[in-house]
């Protein structure tokens, strides 16, 4: 009995240390690896520089078994309130979508306090430009490029999709993005009422220009917005209002709220150990795959 107690105590201590020393997204990475999650996909490029001036890098994930046909592409932007996060902690996302048949590009971007709006959007646009110029080398189809992101990353994905200036200024051809999915992203959050949003956006002279919903348009590519009904970080109203506005304009938009899921649950549900939380991965992958084929 004493030995059993010692073993249990050691496990508890190890788990406590794990949660304290390892960033939450990277915990999902480690658990995903331990469970052999999405072993049909792998990282095929690491630390590729896409913006030399600012030292920005990206990783590429792809299915291990690829045929002759080029694959659809997903550029995924991770979250972190515009001030935290790094691509290395989100390998579980890259593997998950690559196992669904995508070539996945996971870029970093600059954050507060080093930069503020709109610099992180410009970094995202530069990553998409890299995809335009290079993704064929990794088996990706530059005619089937999609975007997605969680939280602040969902914001970046939506701004690149709706506000034409970012991709245009980066040299990306019009119509390059075929579809976009936002997971728990902030799209309509005036007035700035949190420390994170104030620090990221307060200095911009026209606050409305920071809001994705202000750029909703009838000719936007298909957009899906996902949220959790128990998200207290980025309120579900952001997704509700964005979908409503796109529908009013005649754009193709889908909305889904997952019962009882929180802000963190939405990204956790992409990791293999937690997919029972909700069909986030299947729903988003299917939407992107189907709409990447549109004319």
Which residue ranges define each predicted feature?
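Mobile cap/lid helix-loop segments that gate and shape the active-site cleft of serine hydrolases
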Residues: 35-40, 185-215, 221
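Short beta-strand/loop motif that positions the catalytic acidic residue
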Residues: 225-227, 231
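Short beta-strand element of the alpha/beta-hydrolase
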Residues: 69-80
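Conserved alpha/beta-hydrolase "acid-adjacent" motif
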Residues: 232-238
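Catalytic nucleophile-loop/oxyanion-hole region of alpha/beta-hydrolase
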Residues: 85-89, 93, 100, 105-142, ...
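Primarily recognizes the serine-hydrolase "nucleophile elbow" in alpha/beta-hydrolase
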Residues: 129-193, 208
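C-terminal catalytic histidine-bearing segment of alpha/beta-hydrolase fold enzymes
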Residues: 247-295
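N-terminal cap/lid segment of alpha/beta-hydrolase-fold proteins
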Residues: 23-67
């Amino acid at each position: 009995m004493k030995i059993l107690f010692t073993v249990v105590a050691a496990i508890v201590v190890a788990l406590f240390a794990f949660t304290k020393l390892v960033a939450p997204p990277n915990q999902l990475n480690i658990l995903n690896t331990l469970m052999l999650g999405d072993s049909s996909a792998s990282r095929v490029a690491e630390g590729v520089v896409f913006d030399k001036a600012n030292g920005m890098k990206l990783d590429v994930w792809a299915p291990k078994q690829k045929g002759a046909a080029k694959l659809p592409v997903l550029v995924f932007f991770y979250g972190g309130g515009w001030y935290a996060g790094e691509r290395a902690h989100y390998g579980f996302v890259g593997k998950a979508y690559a196992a669904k048949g995508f070539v996945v590009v996971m870029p970093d971007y600059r954050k507060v306090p080093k930069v503020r709006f709109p610099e992180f959007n410009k970094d995202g646009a530069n990553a998409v430009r890299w995809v335009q110029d290079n993704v064929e080398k990794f088996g990706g189809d530059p005619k089937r490029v999609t975007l997605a992101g969680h939280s602040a990353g969902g914001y970046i994905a939506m701004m690149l999709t709706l506000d034409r200036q970012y991709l245009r200024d980066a040299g990306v051809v019009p119509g390059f993005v075929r579809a976009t999915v936002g997971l728990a992203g902030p799209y309509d959050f005036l007035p700035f009422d949190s420390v994170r949003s104030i620090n990221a956006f307060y200095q911009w002279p026209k606050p409305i220009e920071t809001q994705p919903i202000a750029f909703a348009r009838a000719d936007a590519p298909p957009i899906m917005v996902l949220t959790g009904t128990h998200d207290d970080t980025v309120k579900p109203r952001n997704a509700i209002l964005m979908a409503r506005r796109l529908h009013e304009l005649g754009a193709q938009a889908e909305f889904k709220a997952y019962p009882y899921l929180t802000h963190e649950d939405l990204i956790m549900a992409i990791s293999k150990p937690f997919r029972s939380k909700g069909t986030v991965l299947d729903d988003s992958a299917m939407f992107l795959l189907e709409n990447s084929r549109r004319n």
